[in-house]
């Protein structure tokens, strides 16, 4: 049974809904999912998980949230090399530029989905199904 961390920040609840669906997919596939906020994850946490899904919505001019999530991610970024990770988040406008930039930052890691998983606004059932698929994929990776 693989232990998967799902580390996310959500301002409106959309990215939180994605995180919960990813956790559901992990559990349905027989894994263990640990949901946590950015203040609960450090670079030392990597050793406890087979994979980590990081989730953050697009903020401002298509950037990561910069008060909680951004500083945490900046701190763990040097340890990403060779780690199994996935990226996900929601957005309200634009075309996903923040996710493309974020994926490029993570080039040294083993990205489960090289393009990340993005959903526009509140996830619908189709979007939640994609999140569950991501969770199952992480549990079986």
Task: Describe the function of each predicted region.
Residues 41:
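Helix-turn-helix
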Residues 2-4, 14-17, 21-38, 48-141:
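FMN-binding flavodoxin-like domain, especially the glycine-rich phosphate-binding loop
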Residues 8-12:
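Aromatic-flanked redox-active Cys/Sec active sites in thiol-based oxidoreductases
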